[in-house]
Each structure stands twice: as structure tokens, then as C-alpha cells.
Amino acid sequence: MLGNVKKTLFGVLCLGTLCLRGLMAEPDAKELVNLGIESAKKQDFAQAKTHFEKACELKNGFGCVFLGAFYEEGKGVGKDLKKAIQFYTKGCELNDGYGCNLLGNLYYNGQGVSKDAKKASQYYSKACDLNHAEGCMVLGSLHHYGVGTPKDLRKALDLYEKACDLKDSPGCINAGYIYSVTKNFKEAIVRYSKACELKDGRGCYNLGVMQYNAQGTAKDEKQAVENFKKGCKSSVKEACDALKELKIEL
């Protein structure tokens, strides 16, 4: 009788396992990307590559971009810029802003492809449309200096503003700079303040200069010094020099 009980229990357990297997779904594309990131953190690049490949096959743009980065940097695979470009392109086509931005970098610098500032600007433009902050900032710089696209200060400012809104501190600083040279000091202060809040020492230094010189605000030497200190702690040489000139120790 005991033998029959054991057989019954075993049968139930087997049935439970079969049911469990049936309920356990394969990881979806997003989960595969997360698994890939975890494997990469553990320096298991071969396993990470496998996860990213599967995610990319499932049309996850971020997975394709990670795979491209592995080929660009030679992690878990031989370094291969052509393959990197192939996967960045697929990521960009799948509307991943990082992929578009990285493609822009490669075309701008002529890495793995012929140098082409115009094509780079097109990829940066798509990256920006997809709300990739760095893409907006770099595209703004291209318009600012007329590289690969007509020079357009108004367009540059709009792009810097968008980058700043997306919490890109260089975008805030560049927007602040344009406002400064056009004597719109109050707007410059707003942008430099945001850059400083984003822990960018250059923004803190620029804000301090405006506070010290009473540009767009009442003169405030005490607050200026505090911002020079923040800048100096972030290794901004000009901020450290300002403190030395004022004979103030960090």
C-alpha cells in the first residue's frame, strides 16, 4: 500500500513539474537585454553577447546597440567596426536613439566608414528626434559652427535647449553661452544653474562668474565663491584659479 502512495506522490510531482515547465515562458526581448547587462557586469561577455543577439533578433533596438558596442570595443568578440556599424544601424532603424547617436559619432570621426559630417548630422538629428540628449547637443554644435549643415545660431540654441531639458549639462552650458554673448544674462543664469545642479563644474564656474560680476543678478560674492569651489572640486582649472585670485582656500 505504501508503494502505491509513493507512486501516486511521484506522479503528482511529475505532473507539477510538467505544468511548471509549461508555465515558464522564454524571456522576452527586454528581459534578455537586462540579462545581458547583468552578464556584462560580471565580465561574462560571451553570455552577454548571446543575450543581446537574441534580443536583437526579437527586434529590440537596445539589444542591437549593445551588440554593436561589443564589436566596436572588442568585448567577447574580435573588434570589428563593420559589424558594429551593422548593429548600430539596425538599432537606429528600430528607433533606438543611442544607436543613431553612435552611428553619428562613427561617421563624424570617420571610424569604420568614410568621414561624412553631413551623414553624421542626419543620424544625430534622428537621435535627437528620439529624445537622445547627446544627439541634440552634438547636432546643436554642428549648427552652431556650420559643420555638415548650414550655420544657424537660432537652430543651435533650440537644440541646446532641448538637450538641457533632457538633462544634458553640456547642452545647458552651450545654451547659457549663447545667451551670455547675446547679453541675455538672466536666461544664461538659468541654464548655468541647471548645469551646476547636474553636477557639471563648468556650469558652476560660469554661474559664479555671473554672480561675481553682477550679470543678470545682484552681485553676490559669497555665492560666487561657493560656486567656484564646486567648480574647482570638479577639476575646473578656471574655478581653482578664481579662488587663488581671491585668496580663498578650497
UniProtKB/Swiss-Prot annotation:
Result, substituting residue 4 to S: In strain: ATCC 49503
Outcome recorded upon mutating residue 11 to W: In strain: ATCC 49503
Catalytic activity reported: a beta-lactam + H2O = a substituted beta-amino acid
GO biological process, one term: response to antibiotic
Cysteine pairs bridged by disulfides in the record: 56-64, 92-100, 128-136, 164-172, 196-204, 232-240
Xref: Gene3D superfamilies: Tetratricopeptide repeat domain (1.25.40.10)
Enzyme Commission identifier(s): 3.5.2.6
Stretches forming TPR repeats: 29-62, 67-98, 100-133, 134-169, 170-202
Outcome following mutation: residue 235 to G: In strain: ATCC 49503
EC category name: hydrolase
Transmembrane segments: none
Pfam families per the UniProt record, alphabetical: Sel1 (PF08238), TPR_8 (PF13181)
The keyword Repeat is assigned to this record: yes
Keyword terms: Antibiotic resistance, Disulfide bond, Hydrolase, Repeat, Secreted, Signal, TPR repeat
One CC-aspect GO term: extracellular region
SMART domains: SEL1, TPR
InterPro entries: HcpB-like, Sel1-like, TPR-like_helical_dom_sf, TPR_rpt
Cross-referenced SUPFAM superfamilies: HCP-like
Residues making up the signal peptide according to the UniProt record: 1-25
Note: Antibodies against HcpA are present in sera from human patients infected by Helicobacter pylori.
The protein's assembly and partners: Monomer.
Protein family according to the UniProt entry: Belongs to the hcp beta-lactamase family.
Functional summary from the UniProt entry: Slowly hydrolyzes 6-aminopenicillinic acid and 7-aminocephalosporanic acid (ACA) derivatives. May be involved in the synthesis of the cell wall peptidoglycan.
Entry-linked PANTHER family: CYTOCHROME C OXIDASE ASSEMBLY FACTOR 7
Protein name, entry field: Beta-lactamase HcpA
Source organism: Helicobacter pylori (strain ATCC 700392 / 26695)
